[in-house]
Curated annotation (Swiss-Prot):
Keywords, in A-Z order: 2Fe-2S, DNA-binding, Iron, Iron-sulfur, Metal-binding, Repressor, Transcription, Transcription regulation
InterPro entries recorded: Tscrpt_reg_Rrf2 (IPR000944), Tscrpt_rep_HTH_NsrR (IPR023761), WH-like_DNA-bd_sf (IPR036388), WH_DNA-bd_sf (IPR036390)
Cofactor field: [2Fe-2S] cluster
NCBIfam families: PRK11014.1 (NF008240), rrf2_super (TIGR00738)
Gene Ontology cellular component annotations, sorted alphabetically: cytosol
Cofactor: record remark: Binds 1 [2Fe-2S] cluster per subunit.
Protein name per Swiss-Prot or TrEMBL: HTH-type transcriptional repressor NsrR
Binding of [2Fe-2S] cluster, residues: C91, C96, C102
Recorded GO MF terms: 2 iron, 2 sulfur cluster binding; DNA-binding transcription factor activity; double-stranded DNA binding; iron ion binding
Protein function: Nitric oxide-sensitive repressor of genes involved in protecting the cell against nitrosative stress. May require iron for activity.
């Protein structure tokens, strides 16, 4: 299973925000510059993360974006569930003749649940706390 770029960059944006010193806000432009991604794409990602409560956006002259809650309460599995379409096969297709007897969807569903259960063991803080090599790469020391 490969995550979509939407989920990948959503996780990267959260990692960047979690790596910043406490209280420091950033901007979508700054995040897109760090990861060299499309600003339009990142706006959509940040909007969805904001709707889900993972990010808070503050308007105005001193505004910006920051984590919506502490990094140690943001579960990676929850972020992936929010951003990633997790249906691996389309069993509603009228062209699939084995749908009535197929067990593939159930097997794939169990695999996805195992994947998410493992990600549930990690918080955003687990990925960034005391990770000096990461801080150096992101230039946030």
């Amino acid at each position: 299973m490969q995550l979509t770029s939407f989920t990948d960059y959503g996780l990267r944006a959260l990692i960047y925000m979690a790596s910043l010193p406490d209280g420091r806000m950033t901007s979508i432009s700054e995040v897109t510059e760090v990861y060299d991604v499309s600003r339009n794409h990142m706006v959509k990602i940040i909007n969805q993360l904001s709707r889900a409560g993972f990010v808070t956006a503050v308007r105005g002259k001193n505004g910006g974006i920051r984590l919506g809650k502490p990094a140690n309460t943001i579960c990676i599995g929850d972020v992936v569930r929010e951003l990633e379409p997790l249906s691996l096969v389309n069993c509603s297709s009228e062209f699939c003749h084995i749908t009535p007897a197929c067990r593939l969807k159930q097997a794939l569903s169990k695999a996805v649940q195992s994947f998410l259960k493992e990600l549930d063991n990690y918080t955003l803080a687990d990925l960034v706390e005391e990770n000096q090599p990461l801080y150096k790469l992101l230039l946030v020391e």
